[in-house]
């Protein structure tokens, strides 16, 4: 007999015969939810319900509605789609079919050029396969059998994958009816757990992401635990498409990106206004919270990057140039530069903490296929800062940073923020005592403030734990922006020290921290969060004055001057155009406040006020309208 324990929903234990299946354990220990369980965590490892459990251990259920459960049924759907495509197009060769956020894809090599017109036939075939409700069966094969099987099928992509599996490592396949795929799993017990699915798009993808390899056809899809969940997801995706920051910015003339500078932004005048407002806003917050703003070089000698460790771990993502036979790298991050400023003179413990901030222009050689508007670029500005402090000061610095972070997010209109703590990985440096203290330094401020957080077990960097802060936007999408990362390694590698109270040299802790992440990406998030209708305090044009006729142009110019003197960003449209056309144009440009001026308004020294999103017009004395406007544009 073996003993199985669980902590779900309360700590319990039960005895089972040796080699009991996960399905039997699920039925016995979790009878109320057994029908929705698709897999188990056994001693922290995910496995399917058919796999035997042969020793004492702990289990936790994975339900279909959970994130892990959804990932499993999307994996099922990827296999079902591959089976369907091969049944429709028998010459299909299979490459890879992983899950991704909210979905899955599979890469195919076939003579037929797939298009969205094929989706109906593929989805119908998938539905037929699901209706059979055949089981997913895991088998462990000898390497020779696997090679022979895929050779006979001419599946050269699978053979290439097999060739990279280390000798001695277990090779597993999953059978589904007559369909067999090389796969680690796990899968749900059978196809019926794929309750709702939809194919979404097609793209090209080089095998293994290498442009030297063949271009394959990648079919994307999504799968959910219910038709209602699928419908909700599709609605959100349609809403997200309407909010696409690239389209909105193009319509409004805020920025563009072109092939001659992939991953780099051409900011137009109005977009640059938004950028500078955000930068200045953060600058004021930094000053208030005791940061020193610095500026460091954009390009540094290879030797510094070797010392910092970035050359070894990050070289592929760095842009490297040669000058007088020296290799220089355009900086992908600011931290080594800030250490140079810290160590430019002897520091005393009395100076700590030193909070050093920079709007640092960084560059990373991201793959061209991963670039996406402002969300993933090659050239970007980090709202980056590094706090040099003692171990004893970390807790208070994290507390102060959290207060700053929440002030900023609230001002930008984000109320839902989740926190994750990534703790010590298996491969790490530093003693357990240092890690204990460091993790406590991150947890204690959150506990003191009553902030709930989840733990990403083992996901910290080798040089220290971190907190990640994730925003939820207006349509429920999550965006990880803020970070607090402790670092014991970099100051030591680069020779940073301070003189302690004991008169000896001590290595400071560096806290890497960011609020927005990058300004570019944060602007993209803002555009999509507000669907382009950004708050008046951020709007590049806060007020537009529209004339009904040329007779009131002088009065309109006086109004524009009056608003401009109060630092309102104002534009005057006195063109000889129909007023309805002018209003439609202002609405299209998402101007927060519009003043319409005709003969009547000029005679009474009034304006007719229109707010974006409201079809109503309110007549108001010019002075009162300005006062109301100033209140509106100052609200955060």
UniProtKB/Swiss-Prot annotation:
The keyword RNA-binding applies. It comes from Anaplasma marginale (strain Florida). Keywords: Aminoacyl-tRNA synthetase, ATP-binding, Cytoplasm, Ligase, Metal-binding, Nucleotide-binding, Protein biosynthesis, RNA-binding, tRNA-binding, Zinc. GO terms for biological process: threonyl-tRNA aminoacylation. Homodimer. Zn(2+) binds at residues 335, 386, 512. Its cofactor is Zn(2+). Residues 1-63 form the TGS domain. Binds 1 zinc ion per subunit. Catalyzes the attachment of threonine to tRNA(Thr) in a two-step reaction: L-threonine is first activated by ATP to form Thr-AMP and then transferred to the acceptor end of tRNA(Thr). Also edits incorrectly charged L-seryl-tRNA(Thr). Transmembrane segments: none annotated. InterPro entries: aa-tRNA-synt_IIb, aa-tRNA-synth_II, aa-tRNA-synth_II/BPL/LPL, Anticodon-bd, Anticodon-bd_dom_sf, Beta-grasp_dom_sf, TGS, TGS-like. It catalyses: tRNA(Thr) + L-threonine + ATP = L-threonyl-tRNA(Thr) + AMP + diphosphate + H(+). This is Threonine--tRNA ligase. One of its GO terms (cellular component) is cytoplasm. Pfam families: HGTP_anticodon, tRNA-synt_2b, tRNA_SAD.
